[in-house]
């Protein structure tokens, strides 16, 4: 297959689902990983896509309604999420009562937990998170409610009622987008409601967001920028520091 033909197929796939991992593209085009990475580099230079760690996305738009699958999210920005997760794990004390939000960045945090952090107690609405925490021997609470298939997050009235019964020393949150003027946002209103309820019960809140999520706006508002500190690999715009505390893992 000629390079131009591969370019067209890559852009066609992105037009349909907005994001794609290198592995997805290899399978779709029956091409090697090295070939796909060269193609992504060239298309990125041409401004036709944004190359990110583990795959590619269409050029950013100020407002988005798309939502990648849970599996796709876990394949994107892997190293960034790992560095953020390690920094977040170091903030957890044995006596903490933690809320751990559903999402790929917070799942990376669950994987990174070790030592004293394993003695903390956790409440999470992420099914995969609860399973992993339990496997690590943590004390973990999983609220009841409706399971949302796209993210494997527990949502709905029952989840809201359960979360409102707790007080958290720290909350570690995920968001699909963070933007000046729009705050922290996510595609689904019911997930946003659960996130907001947990934030309301937390003494300290950290949003784990990699640099690809800045300047992205989704339909459902979680909270404004003042409501939580940001833990990121890199903040692309210093203006965000006017609104909240930001800790970067890349110095």
Task: Go through each PLM region and give its residues.
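Conserved phosphate- and dinucleotide-binding cores of soluble alpha/beta proteins
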Residues: 2-12, 19-25, 30-32, 45, ...
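Pocket-edge structural micro-motifs
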Residues: 60, 102, 209
């Amino acid at each position: 297959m000629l390079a131009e033909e591969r370019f067209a197929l890559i852009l066609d796939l992105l037009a349909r689902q907005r994001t794609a991992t290198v592995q997805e593209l290899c399978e779709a085009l029956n091409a090697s990983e090295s070939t796909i990475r060269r193609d992504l580099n060239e298309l990125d230079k041409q401004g036709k896509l944004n190359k990110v760690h583990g795959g590619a996305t269409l050029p950013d738009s100020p407002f988005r309604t798309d939502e990648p699958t849970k599996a796709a999210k876990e394949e994107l920005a892997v190293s960034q999420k790992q560095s953020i997760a390690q920094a977040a794990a170091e903030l957890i004390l044995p006596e903490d009562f933690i809320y751990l939000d559903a999402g790929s960045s917070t799942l990376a945090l669950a994987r990174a937990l070790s030592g004293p952090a394993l003695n903390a107690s956790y409440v999470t609405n992420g099914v995969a998170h609860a399973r992993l925490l339990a496997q690590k021997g943590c004390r973990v609470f999983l609220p009841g409610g409706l399971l949302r298939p796209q993210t494997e997050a527990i949502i709905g009235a029952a989840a809201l009622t359960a979360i409102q019964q707790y007080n958290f020393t720290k909350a570690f949150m995920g968001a699909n987008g963070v933007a000046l003027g729009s705050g922290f946002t996510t595609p689904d209103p019911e997930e946003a409601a659960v996130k907001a309820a947990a934030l309301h019960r937390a003494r300290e809140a950290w949003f784990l967001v990699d640099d690809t999520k800045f300047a992205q706006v989704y339909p459902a508002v979680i909270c404004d920028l003042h409501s939580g500190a940001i833990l990121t690999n890199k903040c692309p715009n210093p203006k965000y520091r006017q609104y909240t505390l930001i800790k970067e893992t890349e110095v």
